[in-house]
Amino acid sequence: MLIGHSLHHMRPTAVDSSLPTSATSQTISNTKSRLDPHRVRELTFIGVGSSVAYLLNELNGRFADSGVTTPFLGKVSIVGKDDSWAENVRGKGYINHQTEIISQWDQQVPKYDPNYAARAEFSASNRRQLTRTVELGAEHLKAQVTGISRLDDGCFRINLDNGQILQSRQIVLGTGAGPHTSIWNSVTSHTQAEKRLDNIKLHEQKALRGKVLDLDEFMRASDASPQTFAGKTVVIHGPNAGIDAAERAGELGANAVWFTRSTNPVLLDGNQLKFAPELAKSAIHKVDKLDIRPTKLENGFALRLHYSSLGQDSREPKKVLDADYYVYAMGQDIHKPGSAAAILGSLLDHLEPIYDYDQVYSDQPFKTVIGLQSRGSNSDNGLIIVGAAVAQLATNVQHSYKDHALDRILEEMTRLPEKQTEKLSQMLLEGAPSVQIQTYLKTWQLDSGQPPDKQVLQNQVENYLAARDYFQRQTNEQKGNLDGVAAEVKNQTLTEVASVIVSPQLGTIKASAAALSGLMPAYVANGENNFTTDNRTMLRAGIAARYPNIGNAEASAFIDEVVTLRHLNSQRFIEKVAGEMMDKGAQPLVSLRPPVLGVPASVRTAYEAYLHALNSGAHDGTPLSQRWLPKK
């Protein structure tokens, strides 16, 4: 899907009626005329975080050399206040991924650096994309969206918290997964996420302020006054998001106690954490029901926690723990004001998945969902949901691949003799076995002028049957309890490095943005590839540009090996390299840098040397993994 396709159509852009009007959008794009506030935008982005910034990167690159100074003037709007990675939201520090994995696409591939990416630099790179879009004529409205509705003409009405109303043909919604689920809500009706935390009770809430903090509040407070937490008892509640809090507590010299309900923290492969791994072994308490009260003791503790374990008999006394601070990180709330579910309202019931139709992830598009959209969306019009919100909403969105595939088949049938297509149509609609349908197709006898149409239809039918069989297997394996399209959203991780294990991580948000927009990084044209994150299309384009003599089969084999290698976790990677060596003791395997940390410069050079030799006709059968071995 080419986001903002209508921007190429050069529709006239409305200006204030009291001002002279221009004939085309291009003319208006080069004027300073005051725009009509009631105009219909071609494209509106909601959100200013990473998912939107990745897409702005593609849009900026597409129009930067268009010959028009401000191609987005009057046509593109961006609505949003803060990037959730900004210092004023999540504090300082780092992101638990390398720059190679999460950085914006630029003129060159990022240099290899196994250390974690700086949060400030990542946020600044998002900001640079936003700034560039504004320089190209887009307006940035620092407001919060309160609701979206669809109009009779197919456009969308967007309500802002400042009272402003926008209309737009296309919307990209990238507001993230929502704020941390609150445990403070004792007045208004609870959201679904808040109801899941009704096992936690806060008593005398006014006295708890400043002592009971969500993860972001804790990060900001410890940035501002790290000495405040030194030597204090900090209770961290939450398995995975809590990892950041546990690591920070260790850095501050605090006494950390870690609460989880049933699952243990999942530490990412290749992590460089100093304190969280040990705390995950020694400081875990399995907690079900929890009551938190303020207390004043001689030793200065400010909180008293009464808790029970999962499955504990209600007649047993609760355990007691005194602490200075309680930090919670137990998921995000997609239904809070300003978040995707709250914004969408009734549109939630009209969403469908966006499949990997360009086959970026595999040759079976139905296995991977890269976003969500309002039904009937296309490159010119509609609502597209991207980023972390996709995984949050995916469980309530149903598959539509088979329906669309069948529609395409029925349309293709109109080009062929009715006497043959009628039976095929009946077999498909009645759910005939795949073997029976394929056998029938082979019996067709068509006129000499019709084979191309038959081949198209045959391909479509085979694709439909493969999808039908896949979804049936999924249904059987899950005993009918399919979780919407969640499994296919998670399949985005299957081509990423081993530290990317769930779809809301930045690695998959970046990858899905590229797949959705068809982005081709500038560094590919400059003779480089990022072997850590480039998708199959990017890798194939790079090979074609640099090594034109390499055939499709050889290129595909190389790409498959690159993707398979980078997806291995550290242990499996080392085992693979060792298993391929004739003399396992000949190389110092302990010094191997696994792909989860990125691709070192020496390995990049070795990959390019392999491709150069292949381009020259030399066939080296040595596995690519052997090129990761340190030189003697």
From Swiss-Prot:
Domain of life: Bacteria
InterPro entries the UniProt entry points to: FAD/NAD-bd_sf
SUPFAM superfamilies, per database record: FAD/NAD(P)-binding domain
Region (Disordered): 13-34
Main localisation: secreted
Bias (Polar residues) ranges: 15-32
Protein name as catalogued: Effector protein hopAD1
